[in-house]
Each structure stands twice: as C-alpha cells, then as structure tokens.
Amino acid sequence: MKKYFDKVYKEGMERFQKELYDRLIYDKKTFIITANPETLMTGKENREFDSILCSKNSIITPDGIGVVKGANQVGYHVKERVTGVDIVKYLFSILDKEGRSLYLFGAKPDIVNTLAKKVSDKYPGIQIVGTVDGYVDDKDAVFDDMAIKKPDVVLVALGIPMQEIMINRHYHKFDKGIFIGVGGAFDVLSGMKKREPHFFVNHNLEWLYRICSEPKRLKRFYRSNIKYLDEIRKMKRNMR
C-alpha cells in the first residue's frame, strides 16, 4: 500500500487543474488513474494492474475520501479529493475553450451517445472524434482508431481494472493525449444517472448514498474496504 500512497497526488484540485491545463496545451501525454480504496485493493490482487499503478507513466488521484484519510493516517499529507467527475468536467471546459478534440469509449450505447450529444450541445468548441460503446467485440481496434485520430483527451469507461489495462496496452502508440479511466462516470455525466445529492458529496458520503440506492454494491464495498482498513492498521502498527 505504501508504494501507492507514495504516488497519490497530494496537492489538491486547484493545483491539479493548473497542471492538467499545461499538459493539454503543451501536448504532454498523460495517464490518470482515479483511485478509491477498491482501486488500490484491486492493485494488491492483480499483478498487471499493480504494475500500472506503480508505473512512471501513471498519475494516481485520490478520488475516494478513504484514500485521503487512509494516506493521512499513515504519515502522508493528501490535501483533498481529486475526483474523476470533477477532472472530466474541467477538461470539458478547457477543450471547449481551446477547440481541442475528445474521444469517448465505454458504457452502454445509449449512455455514451447521450453523453456525446450533451457534450456537443453544452461545449460546441469540442471536436468529438470518436464515440464507441463498451460492448464492441474488438476493443483493441478502438485504440487503433484513436491512434489515427490523435485525440487530445480520451475517456475510457470500461470499469477497473479493464479500462486501465486497455489504456496501458496501447499507450505507446500515442505521442500526446490525456487518458483517463472513468468507471461509471459516463452515467452521471450523461445525465442518465443523477450524481449524489449535495449533502452526501459535501460530506464525502457518496459511498453511503450508492449503497442505499444500490444494495447489491454492499458486498463488494464491504469486502474491499475491510481489506483496505486492515492494510492501514498494519501500516500504523509498523510506524510505532
């Protein structure tokens, strides 16, 4: 767990936005992984994903409050959450302003198509060069298409760890571009699924709202977070 916390972005959203802007403007290739405790525990259990999390190519942002609090309890200073949804919304604004291009890959057909239309309507300056759902048989071919079109931002919604594995597999084909695995963010960004109410967001309780709304999440949440808390306890004991 320490090697993940060493890499987690610690400076907060405002600073990250400035760095993202520079990376976009100067065409600096970037691979962002937005992490909650389940993400980090998947890395502990999946060797390929572990190598991606630890790679010098990737930036890990603290999407979940559990990552912020866990890291801070074992001697790190992570300022605040830097969430995938907020990163994407910021990227939409600067893509629109700068007239840059976007590729959307993942989720169900109706969701990704609705998102593409919503982005086009709200951000007319964005050039959407690809809209592909996550149910295509040949996902590698989608990345070949991206390599031809050279988008400035690529959003991949295939779920962890598949989205990161696919990005990593094809990352060498690109000279530029900001690549982000966004999980279920297309559902929220498209408006097909409402983001958690402000109370839950402001108090970092989105996880509670999701469990109440979708009880089937409870088993997965419980399993990954109990293991994560155990990792934090072990690290704290070793600090004594």
Show the residue positions of the predicted features.
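N-terminal nucleotide/polyanion-binding subdomain common to many enzyme families
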Residues: M1-E80
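A short helix->loop->beta-strand "cap" motif at the edges of active sites that frequently abuts
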Residues: K29, R100, F174-I178
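Short glycine-rich anion-binding loops that position phosphate/pyrophosphate groups of nucleotides
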Residues: N36-T39, L158-Q163, A185
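A transmembrane-helix-recognition feature enriched in membrane-embedded lipid enzymes
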Residues: G66-A71, R195-R240
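Conserved beta-alpha
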Residues: V68-D145, K149
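Short Gly/Thr/Asp-enriched flexible loops that form oxyanion-binding sites at enzyme active sites
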Residues: A116, E164-K173
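Short, flexible loop segments at boundaries between secondary-structure elements
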Residues: G134-D138, D175-S213
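Proline-aspartate-enriched helix->loop->beta-strand connector
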Residues: K150-L155, I160, K176
